[in-house]
Amino acid sequence: MREPAFSFRLHLFAAMILLVDVFSALSITTQTFRNVQRHSTDRQLRARDSQAKNYVIRDEERMPLRKLPYDLNLSLSSPPVATLRTALELLYPQAGPSQLWHFEFVTQMKRELSVMQSHPKKLIFDQLIGAMRSMNRNMHMKWNHASDISELSPYTQLILPIALKLRQRLSEGASNDADWMSLLMRLIPYGFLRKEVELLLRTAGYDNVQNYIALYDQMLSKVSAEDTLKFQLLDSNIAPNFQELNKEFLYRSVSLLASKTDGVTADSIVQTTCWSFILIQLTKAKYPQDELQKILEDSMPAEKVVAVMKSYKEGFPNPAHR
């Protein structure tokens, strides 16, 4: 009787050892599987982080460039208005002060204006002057009736090649809302005013001007002052021939900010996000104090001018600490 008992205990002990080995193996296998999963996940995260860092390093803390179609020779389907806000939300928050596609857009338009043949240039210039006179008579707007292209403001000069493109599309019967919305994606953040957008449409020969102006108003209402200011060309590396345009754009930006922050007191105006942003850019660009003061005086009350200039002269906000 003792021998079976001893044998039974021996077999039981062996079975227990076997079970321990099995559970140990299962535990090791499970841990290995988890480690593999964790390693795979970490590797993916590192890859994404590496990509993000690359974008930060190469693109100055902005997302990869998303170019919208501007080629007016393309046939585009008209996008639903419901997608407008989505398109704006995707595009504008990802853009930084050094976003270059608007710079490229202006460069392209200025280049096309310089090489434009004399006959179409004269034709579109006459259309522009005619549209100016029509708007002045019908809308009581003050326009300088220039006799030469060089006398036009930088923004008005850009209207000529753009209007010529749109006019060609109209003559082909191919112009549609998609062309216009795509173009507005560039005109609005670059600071084109409502009257200039209307002038562009009239110069191009559009009949239903108000319908297209309505799209401009709708898009503009969805763009905040901060988003618009992100497209400034306030950069120390700006090309010298863009200085005049840059100054004009700054004037428009300050006017926009003044209207957006009309209810903010003079004591706290420089602490707002949008004013803080523009002062950072101005400080980086070492913008002349006297020129900034003139622009401010045309856009806001005296007490706010004093507050902004005081902060700017003191070097606030200092870009080195941002």
Curated annotation (Swiss-Prot):
Swiss-Prot/TrEMBL keywords: Glycoprotein, Host cytoplasm, Host nucleus, Secreted, Signal, Virulence
Signal peptide feature range: 1-25
Induction trigger: Expression is up-regulated during plant colonization, 3 days after infection.
Entry annotated with the keyword Signal: yes
Record bears the keyword Secreted: yes
Any single GO CC term annotated in Swiss-Prot or TrEMBL for this entry: host cell cytoplasm
Glycosylation: residue positions: N73
Highest taxon of source: Eukaryota
Motif (RxLR-dEER): 43-62
Cellular localization per UniProt: Secreted; Host cytoplasm; Host nucleus
UniProt domain comment: The RxLR-dEER motif acts to carry the protein into the host cell cytoplasm through binding to cell surface phosphatidylinositol-3-phosphate.
Homology family: Belongs to the RxLR effector family.
Entry function: Secreted effector that suppresses pattern-triggered immunity (PTI) in plant host.
Protein name: Secreted RxLR effector protein RXLR-C17
Source organism (scientific name): Plasmopara halstedii
Lineage: Eukaryota, Sar, Stramenopiles, Oomycota, Peronosporales
